[in-house]
Amino acid sequence: MAITFEAYAKNNLCYKAARTMPQGSPAGIIIHSTGCDNPYLWRYVDSPEICGKNPYGTHWNVPMPIGNGGKPTKICCHAFIGKDKSGTVRAAKILPWTICCWNCGDGSKGSYNYNPAYIQIEVCEDALNDRTYFEEAFGLAADLCKRLMKNYPTIKPENIISHKEACARGYASNHGDPEHWLARFGKNMDWFRAIVAPEKQVKLTAEITVDQSKAEEVSRKLRQLGCSVKIE
């Protein structure tokens, strides 16, 4: 089942640049939050039939969207998570996953926009006091990260980070998101990484004694379950 719906920002300069990730696939994922009290996707995503119409034209399907500073900015993420026009929490994909985005800025060592390039997801903030929305939004973000890890094995749990952590590594601008939101509900990025990490695999070894006449039948059933069988 699709986790995202596509609403590509084809008019955005970042989409038009179509700079392919230099390593061929994403090295990780950055989770952002928007810093604006508006949980509805229409604020950022140009898809009126799904998100509803943006009456102000402030979505990101323009060459340079209006940034939080109120000025046109070269900016674009890969996806937004927020509410559609019915109030359902959805994920909108606005860039192909393997195109470099323009979303985390520069740090002292470079930028995770480019090299290595990270997928970057914005979670639409509300007033930061609605636990139900918080759990739905970050639950969907976790599901999306799991799907991306499956599709791109280059993404490891330790490289699913926040904008704040990307800054601390020296590869993003000085922002604190989304830790301020996570902290409101007693969570942090270690919690998020724990829920997206693949479950640890363990090896089971067992012995079973059956009547000789039933050995082949039992062996066949065990092999169907993926077990190695040795009859002695």
Regions of interest found by a model, annotated:
Residues 34, 124-126, 205-209:
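Short strand-loop junctions, especially beta-strand C-caps/beta-turns
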Residues 2-10, 17-23, 27, 116-119, ...:
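Basic/polar, cationic surfaces and motifs that engage anionic cell-wall
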Residues 38, 86, 128, 211-213:
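Generic "edge-of-domain/loop-turn" microfeature
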Residues 33-35, 83, 145-153, 226:
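Sec/Tat-exported extracytoplasmic proteins
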Residues 1-114:
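N-terminal catalytic cores of peptidoglycan-degrading enzymes
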Residues 92-95, 161, 230-232:
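General small-molecule cofactor/ligand-binding pocket signal
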Residues 89, 155-158, 227:
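A structural micro-motif
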Residues 200-232:
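Solvent-exposed beta-strand motifs enriched in subsets of small alpha/beta binding domains
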